[in-house]
Amino acid sequence: MSYSFLRESKLYIVYGGNKYRIHTTTAISFSQTFAEDSYPVKTLHDQSKMLEGSTITKANEANFSFTVPLTIEKDESIVLDLLSDLVDNEQLKSFDMYVQTGSSTFKIESAVITEGAFTFQPKDQFKVELTGQGIKLSRVGDESYTIPGSAQSESATRTPLLIYPVITLDSLDMNNLLGASLRISTNINWTAFETLQNSLSVTNSSNAMFPSTYTIDSRTVSGELRQYQTDNNITQFDDFSTNSNLIIKAVQVGKASSDNGFFQ
């Protein structure tokens, strides 16, 4: 099952007993597929049954993606915490995600954000593209369903955050920037969860086997820097250094480059 909703949908994140309304751009996408096991039905006495039979007993992890425009008020900062922070047991912070439309409320249980992509484009609104996974996707009610959690107050205004990138990379000339990008990725591996005993009791999606635990394989930070070519930076394009000190700041338009920036 796969869903993609436009502006009429609302996204909520419930974390630590608190409920956060997250404003997104045009689309929220989420899906979950089920795995099928096939078995032969051809017998010695009936060789005509070439098509195998199948059973569905387990689900793959749920997937989701959405884009959040960042604002000066920072009401959406919870998504940045969920992207970057780990809890004490070296796991990603998990939360329940709800999407409410004009007719339904969907829930992804024990969701984690596995990737966040930032684009630092001069004088553009700063956004973060988020993708992640969860244990189970289900429809929990209609449009009047009450989402649990203590509602966190929102600012009276939502002011788009227009930024420009400020880059420091050792002693290199990082002026005349066209833009920059940054991607934070966490590679996770879901633990095998199916058992023969549980599979025998599966009758439909409500009691199918769902993933429950995962391990973190690795975390990576990647990106790119784009510059106009000038006499001062023409020799910098093929620097293969792997131990450089890099600082990327998203500075609000109108503030000096020495500002600490909204994001660093």
How would you name each of these model-derived features?
Residues 1-264:
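Signature of extracytoplasmic/envelope-associated structural regions
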